[in-house]
Amino acid sequence: MSIPEYYSPVMPYMVVKGADEFIKFIKAVFDAEEKLIVRNPDASIMHAEFIVNGGAILFGEAAESWPPFPAPLYLATSIVDELYKQGIANGATGNMEPQDKEYGRAAGFLDKWGNQWWLNSPDYDPK
């Protein structure tokens, strides 16, 4: 088996409680593209791969032997405000409203699985 072309050298791997609901969230907020879902015999998600904003994220369903393990994620995007609004509308909690920073337009929210999403438009020039 060869490495999928959408893999990058480093990718986040989260363990979430309620992986099917997490999929609905990332599809609604980021228009995430499904690449792979492998299910356990009980139909829970053993492993999933999705493309978010051009990059791959990987995750699986939490279990007794695999407790939830969230991650901070950074997205370089030109639509900071739009993604922030979509995150909040889909149950995330804002912890940095969209604002202009010396490094670009930025915002942040925490999803209900404990993942921190940082949104940044690095090409923004505040001058």
Q: Where does each model-flagged region fall?
A:
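Vicinal oxygen chelate
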Residues: 1-5, 9-17, 38, 46-51, 59, 62-88, 105-110, ...
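N-terminal beta-strand motif that seeds the catalytic metal site of vicinal oxygen chelate
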Residues: 1-24, 35-36, 71-73, 120-127
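Residue-level marker of positions within ordered structural domains that often coincide
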Residues: 17, 31, 55
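Conserved active-site alpha-helix within GNAT-family acetyltransferase domains
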Residues: 20-29, 107, 115-116
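Conserved acetyl-CoA-binding loop of GNAT-fold acetyltransferases
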Residues: 28-35, 91-93
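Conserved short beta-strand elements that form part of the metal-binding/catalytic scaffold
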Residues: 34-70, 117-121
